Structure formats: C-alpha cells, structure tokens
Amino acid sequence: MSFFGFGQTAEIDIVLNDAETRKKVEHKTEDGKKDKYFLFYDGETVSGKVNVTLKTPGKRLEHYGIKIEFVGQIELYYDRGNHHEFVSLVKDLARPGELSQSQTFDFEFTHVEKPYESYTGQNVKLRYFLRATISRRLNDISKEMDIVVQTLCTYPEINSSIKMEVGIEDCLHIEFEYNKSKYHLRDVIVGKIYFLLVRIKIKHMEIDIIKRETTGTGPSVYHENDTIAKYEIMDGAPVRGESIPIRLFLAGYEMTPTMRDINKKFSVRYYLNLVLIDEEERRYFKQQEITLWRKGDIVRRSMSQQATIAAQRYEGSNPEPTSAQAKEETD
Amino acid sequence: MAEAIADTRRLYTKPQNLNDAYGPPSNFLEIDVTNPETVGVGRNRFTTYEIKLKTNLPIFKLKESRVRRRYSDFEWLRGELERESKVVVPPLPGKALFRQLPFRGDDGIFDDSFIEERRQGLEQFLNKVAGHPLAQNERCLHMFLQDESVDKNYTPSKIRQA
C-alpha cells in the first residue's frame, strides 16, 4: 500500500531508559566490523520506550497490534532458516486498532534471564535483541535493537596447575608446567618448560593459543580452529636441565570465555599449543586445554573497608585507618 | 582483597647441573658427504661418495663411521624409508637421465659441476633424514650409514635402543 504512495507508514525507534548511564561495549559483527552495543548482565531488567513516528502527518495508521519482544537466539550459519530461541519474551503494547498520531509506548522486561554470553563466531552467532513490531494486513513494520550480554564469574575455588611430562622416547623429554588451568581474560599465563632429554637439534620454541569453535552434533560435528596468538618463548638449542620460563599476558588478545555445549548447539574452547621446531623444520607439539573466564571489574573499596577485611583475616592486626586516607578513597 | 596486579613470579626450577650446562650436548650428529670418486671405465663407470658420520646419539652403534655409497644406494634407502616408516621422506637430487644421453658437449653425469651439485643435494638429504626420530628407528638407515656395504636382501626391521 505504501508502495504506491497511498496509506500510512511509520518509523519505530527503541530507546532504553538507562541509555545515558549504561555501559556500551564493542562487539564484532558477522562481517568482521566492530560496533558498540549496550551491555547487560544476567538478571538485569531491560526497560525503555518504543517511539512510533507516523511518516505522513494527518493520516491514520491501521494495525493489528503493536508488541515488543526480547529474544535470545542461536543462529548456525549453515542452517540460517532455523533460529534456536532460548529466550523469548513478549509484551503487548497496543491492541489492534489505529494510531492517529505518533505515540510512545513504555515497556519493561523485569529481571530477564540471560544465561549465555553474546558470541559472533566463524560458523555460529548467539545474540540478544529487542524487536518492536507493528502488525499489519500486508506487511509488518519492525525494528530490532541488538544488545550484548556478558557472563561474569568469580575466582574459581579450585584452580590446579597443569604439570605434565611428555616426549618422544629416547629423543626428547620435557616437563611443562602452567601455573593454573583456569585463566581470566586479563590474566597472565606463568609457566616453564624443563628439558629432561634433548637428542634432537632444536631451533626455537613457541607457545600458541588456539581457539576451537565446534558446531553441530553427532555425525555432523564441525571444528573451526583459529590460532589467536603465536608467542616465541625460546630461540636457540637447549640442553638437559635447562628451564625456559613462560609469561604470556592474555589481555593483549581478543578472546571470549570458554563456552561448553551452549544450549547443546556449539562450544568455544581454548588450547595452549607448545611447539618445538628443529633444525630441519620438523615440529613437535603438545596441546593442552585451558579454561577462560570473564572476571567482573575490580570493586574499589575504601581504606577502612580494606582494613576491616584484613583484620578479619589476620589475627592480631589492628585496623587503624587514618581519617585523611579514608576520605580520599571514597568513590 | 581483590588482586589488582597478577602474580608473575617465575615458577620454581631445579638448578641445572653444571656438567649438563657446560658439557657436550646430547644431540651431536654430523654427517658429511665428500670425496666423490668415479670408478670403472667407459660405459661401466659410476661415482661413489664418502659418507662420514660423527655422533654421540646412543641409537647409532658406532660413534664414528666412514663408508662409500653411490647414487643408486641413496635411491634404495629412500625407497626403504618410504615403505617402512611413516616419515615423509625428502626428495633426492635429480636422476639426470638426460645427462646420460650420448653426444653431449660436457662429461654428462661425470661432469665436475654436476657431481658437486649432486653431492650437496645428497648431503642435505642425509642430514634431514638421519636427524628424524622415526627414521632413526629403521634398520635400513643404520645399514646405509654404518655398515661396510648395503645388503639389499636384508630383512627390514626396527632398531630398539639397548
């Protein structure tokens, strides 16, 4: 109808109530570009306004209902038709009728569950978005607004180190050690490689971080490997008894938390690959999985709070914050 | 109290034994292909090369050895390794059949520059192969490098270290 210049059409605009204060983060889109989106956590309320602006003033807009949805869905690139929605909430904004002028509708999705982190990968995408729709006889008018969700963790209670002896019999024996098995995204991998037997001519050694995205189930499982980082840790030939230190700062690399079997649709796992290269370019390697997790931002506490905590932990210490210091530290 | 800065101190390491640190490395293996010599007369001539090996790897029976081999021996070795081991065997320098055709302006396969080119290729080939942990387990490699002559009727087998 609007095709021929007859009838009325409208523009939809979704605005969040806390748009001024809410943090925005960068997130990669499918074609590799980076855009900024509002950041939400699990359990947070999503509320705002839907502004419907009539294009042609004076004319009425007939509709079969106006609604807003909050959707969390997984999209497999090789199966575009099927979106797997794991969160789907609807709020009706207007019953079927007509709008004689531009109007604004309030909405609130209270304490929405957002179980998984937003992810845009090589073969799969998990996204959350608001979608406002004006239903009409021939064609609906709708507008989507993507948001980004991050899942936070606290320090894992158990975080054992990884220590293993590997090698090729009578040729090369090494013992490698990484200080933890679970690292947060801005952590440092501290480790060492200890040479027990070196009967080959090693030229250099590097440690790679590999991201493996797994999609599909059963017989049609597909792995996509991506080397996120290559970091040389040794140049030259080691001998028996030598220890090579590793210190790899993760903050410099673009990584996501480890995602295991998300909604039974996909996984994203990370591996450390230790690679030794000999004089004839032969490669000897050992892969080891690590778990990555996302840490919440550090909460800054006042000196008096910190002192109180310290007093509780260590017997006999006196919490004596000077009043001047306490004043400076309050945020 | 939340950590503001990660602990990046080195992990504990055992101090290295000074004999290990300053002694000879356990990976010493040197192979030279030298002294090409053409033997025979007329159509029955062929060139042999001296293969000198020095090593401290326990898998080699002799720590020093010296043998003479011809190109067809190298071809035999390559064939055996391809069949018996899972190694991707590097190529040999070319067979140069065209050089064996008559009416050439130079000495064909007995030309000095050709022999030198071939010598280099054979040396590269042997160094690549002899340093491979899997190739080192093959009887044929040890026979080629250290036995007086190559017995092409041998029984292929794997070497296990004592």
Swiss-Prot record, chain A:
Protein name, UniProt field: Vacuolar protein sorting-associated protein 26B
Topological relation to the membrane, as annotated: Peripheral membrane protein
Disulphide connectivity of cysteines: none
Keywords, alphabetical: Cytoplasm, Endosome, Membrane, Protein transport, Transport
One example of a Gene Ontology biological process annotation: intracellular protein transport
Entry similarity comment: Belongs to the VPS26 family.
GO cellular component, one term: cytosol
Localization, UniProt: Cytoplasm; Membrane; Endosome
